[in-house]
Amino acid sequence: MHHIFVSPSGVRSIWLRNDLASSKQRLAAMEKLVAEQGILLTDSQVAALERKQDDDLAHGEIETAHPGYLGSQDTFYVGTIKGVGRIYQQTFVDTYSKVAMAKLYTTKTPITGADLLNDRVLPFFAEHGMGVIRMLTDRGTEYCGKPETHDYQLYLALNDIEHTKTKARHPQTNGICERFHKTILQEFYQVAFRRKLYLSLEELQTDLDAWLAYYNNERTHQGKMCCGRTPLQTLIAGKEAWNEKVTNLNLI
């Protein structure tokens, strides 16, 4: 039996040739093998992959496989309406298709965070024969607290939705919602508040819903998955990947 010795520099040169120089690249390659070939991993490999996925999300590096794979949620302060008070927007963006949903509230609490999902998000995905697997939020009190008593976290658990939080003290890492908030501020709120004096939350919500319908159904995007399509077109096109995943899970 011949023993072959490979020096550390030799190992590194092999890694470099195969784009495996960093541990992150090696974990990504392992992740790809699991997705493509369904190979079985050891407990330590599974733990390493889970740490990588959570770390990527926490630092704003989002990999998304299909609609519903990862939803991004955030709170946006809209402003004040006389006679109503402070207005907060709960925002949801599907990181794959960029389909966006939003609802207005006068408070920001765990209940309002859960209400957006219950009233708008999950019914929409159910209507399209899909669900939501994981949510990405910052560490605000409306999204984080004691899991056993926190309304938002209880709602996620009740619906079997995983929860990833952005890196502490770096709320900007939830970049998907940040970009959407800039868009909605410039294209909707700044225009709407110049044109109209709103007297109620319901009146503003009606106009917001009309703009969101335009955003999802007519406004094209140049993002990684959209490629010039609207968010809804991208979601419908990506439904095949969702169906394939469900089929594969049912075969296990």
Name each model feature, range by range.
Residues 1-2, 17-18, 139:
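The DNA-recognition helices of helix-turn-helix-type DNA-binding domains
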Residues 9-11, 25, 135, 166, ...:
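Residue-level detector of family-conserved "landmark" positions at structurally sensitive sites
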Residues 5, 65-91, 95-214:
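RNase H-like DDE/DDD metal-dependent nuclease/strand-transfer catalytic core used by mobile genetic elements
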Residues 10-17, 211:
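Residues in the recognition helix of alpha-helical DNA-binding motifs
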Residues 41-44, 55-63, 157-161, 183-252:
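C-terminal domain-tail junction helix/linker
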Residues 21-93, 115, 119, 248, ...:
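Mobile-element integrase/transposase regions
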Residues 14, 30, 140, 170-171, ...:
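Positions that flank functional sites
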Residues 1-13:
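Short, basic interhelical loop/turn and adjoining N-cap
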